[in-house]
Design a protein with these regions (language model features):
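Short, small-residue-rich loop/turn micro-motifs
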Residues: 45, 152-156, 223
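N-terminal amphipathic, basic helical "cap/leader" segment at the start of enzyme domains
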Residues: 31-146
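Small-aliphatic-rich amphipathic alpha-helix that forms the alpha element of a beta-alpha
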Residues: 59, 78, 106, 148-159, ...
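Helix N-cap/coil-helix junction residues
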Residues: 190, 208-209
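A solvent-exposed interaction/effector surface
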Residues: 25, 203-206
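Bacterial N-terminal signal peptides that target proteins for export
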Residues: 2-15
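Bacterial Sec-dependent signal peptides at the C-terminal "C-region" and cleavage site
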Residues: 19-37
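A glycine-rich helix N-cap at a beta->alpha junction
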Residues: 209-225
Length: 225
């Protein structure tokens, strides 16, 4: 009898160890999968040699880009300027928004895929492995050469009870972010142009946008050719 009990307890112990090990492996795999979907950006310095007035003076639209890569450091500065957190204690951002809805989502499209910018943490969350720059370019194929394309989307659910005016408020909020991008690009020595032309059907599908999210503006970003 003792032998049988020992065998049973030994078997149960092995089963417990196996379950714990399997759970640990599964948890680790899940964590690794999530980690692989998140890309941390360098902390922005939040500084530039160019003054605001100089940036306003020199800002101009560019539609002819080289394929020179935009560094992660410059991308981080640009995204922070677009709608990054500038008041950490209240989580408020650089761009104003109606009723502080912070409804504008910024997607970053490159040859390696598409990411959603996450201001809280200054990181990118991958949403697609596809190069969506041609879809952003739409009928104006030349701008697809730009190494980065930023896509501005309004999430109407952020307006809550004020949803009736969400379409107009979202468009205005996108304008604020767009202007931040224009001025930051100038200060960083980058080139851009605000555009509305894009293949919205393809982008909505590939970025997994539901009916409450509206594609509004896009910005090819790179260096003038």
């Amino acid at each position: 009898m003792n032998f049988k009990k020992t065998s049973i307890f030994t078997a149960l112990s092995f089963m417990t160890v196996a379950v714990v090990a399997a759970t640990s492996i599964a948890t680790t795999s899940c964590q690794n999968a999530n980690a692989s979907d998140t890309r941390s950006l360098p902390a922005p310095t939040k500084s530039a040699k160019m003054t605001l007035m100089e940036s306003l003076q020199q800002r101009h639209s560019v539609r002819d880009f080289s394929d020179k890569v935009v560094s992660d450091a410059d991308l981080s500065e640009l995204l922070w300027a677009a709608c990054g957190i500038n008041r950490p204690d209240t989580k408020k951002i650089t761009a104003p928004s109606a009723i502080n809805a912070q409804d504008i989502l910024v997607y970053v499209c490159t040859k390696d895929g598409a990411w959603l910018y996450v201001p809280d943490g200054n990181s990118l969350h991958k949403v697609s492995d596809k190069d969506l720059r041609p879809a952003v370019a739409g009928r104006q194929e030349a701008v697809a050469v730009a190494p980065v394309s930023l896509v501005l989307v309004s999430d109407r659910t952020k307006f809550g009870d004020c949803a009736k005016g969400a379409e107009v408020m979202g468009a205005i909020d996108a304008g604020y972010v767009s202007q931040n991008i224009c001025l930051a690009c100038t200060a960083l020595g980058l080139a851009t142009v605000p555009r509305m032309t894009m293949d919205k059907e393809t982008l909505a599908k590939e970025l997994h946008l539901d009916e409450n999210k509206t594609l509004l503006v896009n910005h090819p970003v790179g260096y003038e050719k």
